[in-house]
């Protein structure tokens, strides 16, 4: 029987999955962290870290929340730079994105649904 609750550290628990804590890709033996409904990521990006490649035809809704640092999101519709703790960018299905950590940045990402 898998546990229906979990306590941990986001940086440690997400380490094997590039920061992802919750999602369909988490082994069901991890219990409540395995979900087809939502994905949650916590990650600290070093300054200059970037994903220059754009996502392609992503059909999920995404929220990226800045915990600290300076982080830019480029969207097919616009660009946004988050500079203050609590700044966020959210976009819906069909909008592609890339990103860059202008300074060392910790961000929390929430996407849904998890499996498309």
Go through the PLM ranges and name each one:
Residues 1-47, 52-54:
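A short, N-terminal "cap"/entry segment at the start of jelly-roll beta-barrel domains
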Residues 59, 79, 95, 103-104:
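A generic "binding-loop/recognition-motif" signal
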Residues 77-94:
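Short acidic-glycine-tyrosine-enriched beta hairpin
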Residues 59-72, 76:
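Glycine- and acidic-residue-biased ligand/ion/polar-headgroup-sensing regions
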Residues 52-53, 73-74, 91, 96-102:
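Short beta-strand His + acidic residue motifs that chelate non-heme Fe in jelly-roll/DSBH
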Residues 43, 90, 103-116:
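A short hydrophobic beta-strand segment most commonly corresponding to one strand
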């Amino acid at each position: 029987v898998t546990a229906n609750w979990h306590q941990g550290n986001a940086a440690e628990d997400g380490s094997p999955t590039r920061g992802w804590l919750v999602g369909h890709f988490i082994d069901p033996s991890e219990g409540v962290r395995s979900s087809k409904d939502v994905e949650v990521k916590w990650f600290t990006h070093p300054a200059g870290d970037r994903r220059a490649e754009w996502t392609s035809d992503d059909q999920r809704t995404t929220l990226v929340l800045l915990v600290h640092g300076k982080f830019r999101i480029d969207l097919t519709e616009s660009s946004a730079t988050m500079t203050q703790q609590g700044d966020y960018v959210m976009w819906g299905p069909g909008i592609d994105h890339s990103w860059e950590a202008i300074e060392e940045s910790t961000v929390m990402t929430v996407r849904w649904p998890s499996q498309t």
